Amino acid sequence: MSEGPIRVAPHPIAKRVKHGCKTPHVSHIDDYRSQHRETIGHESDKWWAKKAHELLYWDRPFHTVRSGSFENGDIAWFPEGGLNASYNCVDRWAFKHPEKTAIIYEADEPGEGREISYAELLREVCSIANVLKSFGVKKGDTVSVYLPMTWQAIAAFLACARIGAIHSVVFAGFSAEALRDRMQDCKSRVLITSDEGRRGGKAIATKAIADAALKECPAVEKVLVLKRTGNPVPWTEGRDVWWHEAVARVPRYCPPEVMASEDPLFILYTSGSTGKPKGVVHTTGGYLLCAALTVKYVFDVHPDDRFACMADVGWITGHTYIVYGPLAIGVTTTVFESTPVYPTPSRYWETVEKYKLTQFYSAPTAIRLLRRLGHEHVNKHDLSSLRVLGSVGEPINPEAWHWYNEHVGKTECAIVDTFWQTETGSIVVTPFPGAIETKPGAATVPFFGIEPAILEPTTGKVLEGNDVEGVLTIAHPWPSIARTIYGDHQRYLETYMKPYPGYFYTGDGAARDEDGYIWIKGRVDDVINVSGHRLSTAEIESALITHTGVAETAVIGTADELTGQAVYAFVTLKPEFKFDPENEAGLSKELILQVRKIIGPFAAPKRIYIVSDLPKTRSGKIMRRILRKIVAGEADQLGDLSTLADPGIVEVIKEKVASAA
């Protein structure tokens, strides 16, 4: 695993943070160190209680700060406390400054967006909450949300939270089959969707996809449909209800339901190494606190800032840093419906200039794409409002980091390369803009309350000191850690708590350099990270195997200049399947479409190789390690092949890959 000690010189604290008009929340490394010690020490409960009272409104006080352990899988934070996430994110700011912008909605077509005030957001949230109640939704019920990037998606989240319903948001790029599986798994009674979506100038058939999924979801009684484009869509009378018509029939205020701190707030599905998506459950109090804390401290957000996370609300990044984090501290958040290059590669920077955004949080894939298209698209815009630039989804490579720093940040903005996961709920390793010098590619230091431990993979021994590399774990529970996998607590324990008892297992490798900075080294399990999306190799293999001609398949991830990793698939065919070798491209296209249909476009393999056999041990285990080495151009480093049932197949595959290059 080790590539030798990491030696990278740090970059100084950014000028716009250090010498700007706003004093950073954490302004010196000594301040960071003392607070971090306080949050992991014997009296850390005092710090957490103080922050919980500072940042959140509690309807019912808590007396216990935390209980439970990794070993028992019974973690709880502020268990006696009662609160409502919707009230914390909307009502208190609507009462304090009703006309303040809550959401900047930048629609797909330039000029069609608008700003939504906290007062308007409160009315919409309450109206949708009352609509859901009229459908019979009550506390503890699950509502699925399959919406494009419209501002009403935020209202849907918060309407569920307001009445104590659990929202399960499904990314609107997922297929009908993926949506069906998630609705069935979480037992949804209601689906919220739209007639269509818009992205990059193209229509997305959201309602048609939802209808295909609903054919096998008889438990779904009502479908609330947002009119986004107004184009004709399939309709089922008695089940389907237009959003705007339903809102017109209900009261404009809905009192918030007081929820226990440990009541579920949402379920969000993430890829697992077994192929079956995991419904990760986050609870109300601890999750909301960490969302608020991290957006405030990691991005150095102040009350009049305008925060922009360019993710989709269908992923955890959107949940935490479009919806709950910014709104929990009463600042302006951004919903960006389009793509970085529509209608021109200046779209991001036009948006920054137009709304005077102060923080900008995006993925390395987007940064690499825009770098490739040229900095002239950036340089013609006034980006002087920006103070902090963020990166999320995967470690940002140094070339992209330097471009981001020089052309977007003008070498004056802080860059925070953040590490976290769906399961962590919020950022766990990150620079602090006013206190931590950064290194391109390094996640740097743990957030408050996070005590990372790098373990030797085989023995589980803690690797002390610097210049070490191993498996990244976390030593103690923190408030926003996921509490379970929906309907399968044993799988939760087996996945995160059992691999290294006493530690939370992230599934990522990590190194600690000579300065104690943490570097994320990528997945150590069978999960691929494509453009920040975690994809299970087993899930993609399962999609490929449904093709009538496929006998076996092996999927790997390999480095990709644009997307970080790309999906490559090796496929063997059934003997009886009639296949013309001259038409391999046609079959590959069929297989790619199969994956797009079953999972979604983002999971489509970049390359498919039709081969006569796969490298297997005598016991039948497919050696994906060998395939990864061949694709990476490291065929001379395959190591011992004596355990293979047919070592000769390696040469066949090498020739296949070389000829297709």
Swiss-Prot record:
SUPFAM superfamilies the record matches: Acetyl-CoA synthetase-like
Molecular function terms from GO: acetate-CoA ligase activity; AMP binding; ATP binding
Keyword Ligase attached: yes
Coiled-coil zones: none
Pfam families the record matches: ACAS_N, AMP-binding, AMP-binding_C
Keywords in alphabetical order: ATP-binding, Ligase, Nucleotide-binding
Binding locations of CoA: 199-202, 317, 531, 596
Family: Belongs to the ATP-dependent AMP-binding enzyme family.
Chain positions recorded as ATP binding sites: 393-395, 417-422, 508, 523, 534
EC number of the protein: 6.2.1.1
Species whose genome carries this gene: Coprinopsis cinerea (strain Okayama-7 / 130 / ATCC MYA-4618 / FGSC 9003)
GO cellular component: cytosol
Catalytic activity, reaction form: acetate + ATP + CoA = acetyl-CoA + AMP + diphosphate
CDD domains: ACS
Domain of life: Eukaryota
Gene: ACS-1
GO BP terms: acetyl-CoA biosynthetic process from acetate
Protein's name according to its UniProt entry: Acetyl-coenzyme A synthetase
